[in-house]
Amino acid sequence: MNQSLLVTKRDGRTERINLDKIHRVLDWAAEGLNNVSVSQVELRSHIQFYDGIKTSDIHETIIKAAADLISRDAPDYQYLAARLAIFHLRKKAFGQFEPPALYHHVVKMVELGKYDNHLLEDYTEEEFKQMDSFIVHDRDMTFSYAAVKQLEGKYLVQNRVTGEIYESAQFLYILVAACLFSNYPRETRLDYVKRFYDAVSTFKISLPTPIMSGVRTPTRQFSSCVLIECGDSLDSINATSSAIVKYVSQRAGIGINAGRIRALGSPIRGGEAFHTGCIPFYKHFQTAVKSCSQGGVRGGAATLFYPMWHLEVESLLVLKNNRGVEGNRVRHMDYGVQINKLMYTRLLKGGDITLFSPSDVPGLYDAFFADQDEFERLYVKYEHDDSIRKQRVKAVELFSLMMQERASTGRIYIQNVDHCNTHSPFDPVVAPVRQSNLCLEIALPTKPLNDVNDENGEIALCTLSAFNLGAIKTLDELEELAILAVRALDALLDYQDYPIPAAKRGAMGRRTLGIGVINFAYWLAKNGKRYSDGSANNLTHKTFEAIQYYLLKASNELAKEQGACPWFNETTYAKGILPIDTYKKDLDAIVNEPLHYDWEQLRESIKTHGLRNSTLSALMPSETSSQISNATNGIEPPRGYVSIKASKDGILRQVVPDYEHLKDAYELLWEMPNNDGYLQLVGIMQKFIDQSISANTNYDPSRFPSGKVPMQQLLKDLLTAYKFGVKTLYYQNTRDGAEDAQDDLAPSIQDDGCESGACKI
């Protein structure tokens, strides 16, 4: 290697290249790692050096050389590359490897307008010194390379135009903790700050993108998911569109319920005009969604919901596909089709489904969610009423069209609205659930807005986080983690701003949280269980019972301290009804694990003191934030032992946790023979989870004789999901040959899954 090359330092000076210094940094980064070669990294990077190269480019070249060596046989390169990247990041942020004192850092960032000045108003210099003593900067060295790149690309406070970085990861974690507990009493708050900091910086609790990138900055909107219901009037349609623009500009993913909009050809003002139907208004919503990127962190994204019996359903089901022309397609949103038992019954009995415009059938739309018996009574009545415009379609044809579009686009989702209301924390008579969100894990009440400042409307918000099952040894640890997650997210509701009154009203009234899990596949592998063979059923029951029990207990304790949420009376919890009372009893045939916790005592305590939060759990996708914790995505099986994730920061390789010891214990996605075992597990989780679950269905066409997935199989899985009480289905993934070119490398759903959506974490 040419020792006489000149390099350009960060301050502009030039000097001869110092290969010893590079070697020392690499030796430091490789310490304690297995099966990594410093000379390999040096060889790969040296050939890319040139005269006059900047020292920062040398650093980036070495990092890239190490990252390119990450493989199934040498997974530790992900830590070597990460340590080098952390070194580089700290140099960029602080001009040196050693981080500055926390207090001085915060003062400087507040002066620059990067941090919220409330930090200096709420805490004294002395308290910052104490917080500084809580920080363990060496925890930066536990990140994988994929995690560091995600931090750099999405989470660390930075100037997105110039690329300047202003902080390191441990400052992010301690300051999120400081912001969230700033209103707690002075004598207890630093204890909570320390406990929360320890939980998030050791990856036991995983936080969503809006919290990681936003808390501590002057922008205060951190709810990941926003659910907006639209009424059947121009005023409401415009109010919905304004609300969408406000929220996509602030990092949120959107669920839109457009099911009330009347069908094409309906009379307006008693026949004075002829209605243009749903599609022009869906286009209007699509334009609103795409008008802003989510705070520079990701592009806007939405899922729009409508009932299966809508008169225009056959035109709506095809809106996403590649056929058709611009005029009859609205491709840049995803869609959720709403179904109930009556629709499934018609399918099973070979009957018809009758389609109506919601505007022609008084009471039917509301009953679809609030009262299944009343819905059936009205539906049959209107079917026999010759004065009402309608269309009959064979149920099997309509379901087949829906499943064909789900198969070809992967992005037609399913919401079983009866399960969402019968096994719900809300009383459907007063607070029916009429939609879900972008990624199908949220089930909350909404009311249409007539204008953006409508006091009577209700926009639902959900604030997310997750427990990392891979980072805990026993389920008992969940008790402390539940206390921290519930208290932090509950405090966030008071800490954040609400751009629209209808959102503030709902958030303050219901105080809804959605706490889920990541790293479930690792949890199964560690416990020697598999998705597909039933061996995980009892463990899953035990795990999710513990999660929901400890979350309810934490919210009940918080209610004793700070009062129940104001609209607690609209929940089923207020009547002493718990998830263990309303689950789908078909599950009892596939799981025989008894209940392990004292639910009766909890029931009494909830009836007496209430809950601080109307909902506590939801199982969301976690494509991005699971990379920070080096965890598997949500509840999903991994696609490969090494996954390749494309993000705007380039290709990131990530190896499944503890690969060397557990490689034979993991069950990969395409090794599962069918969806049955997975759907059973989702049903068992749904027994306890009070909101919903982003559950996917997966198909490998090569497993079928014709090389195509038969419609019969798609419908069978849809009915299996319904039978086990599954509320929602998210993606449908179809295996194509491309991802098998290298058997250990699996591209994950690209990181714009959910268009890199916000209701993931």
Swiss-Prot record:
Record's keyword annotation contains ATP-binding: yes
GO molecular function: ATP binding; ribonucleoside-diphosphate reductase activity, thioredoxin disulfide as acceptor
EC number, as in UniProt: 1.17.4.1
Disulphide connectivity of cysteines: C225-C462
Residues bound to GDP: T209, N437, E441, E623, T624, S625
Keywords carried by this UniProt record: Allosteric enzyme, ATP-binding, Deoxyribonucleotide synthesis, Disulfide bond, Nucleotide-binding, Oxidoreductase
Catalytic function, reaction form: a 2'-deoxyribonucleoside 5'-diphosphate + [thioredoxin]-disulfide + H2O = a ribonucleoside 5'-diphosphate + [thioredoxin]-dithiol
Domain of life: Bacteria
Annotated site residues (Interacts with thioredoxin/glutaredoxin) in this chain: C754, C759
Keyword Zinc-finger tagged: no
Ranges for domain ATP-cone: 5-95
Enzyme class: oxidoreductase
Subunit field text: Tetramer of two alpha (R1) and two beta (R2) subunits. The B1 protein is a dimer of alpha subunits. A radical transfer pathway occurs between 'Tyr-122' of R2 and R1.
Other remarks on this protein: S.typhimurium produces two separate class I enzymes. This one is the functional enzyme during growth.
Protein name per UniProt: Ribonucleoside-diphosphate reductase 1 subunit alpha
Naturally occurring in which organism (per UniProt): Salmonella typhimurium (strain LT2 / SGSC1412 / ATCC 700720)
Organism placement in taxonomy: Bacteria, Pseudomonadati, Pseudomonadota, Gammaproteobacteria, Enterobacterales
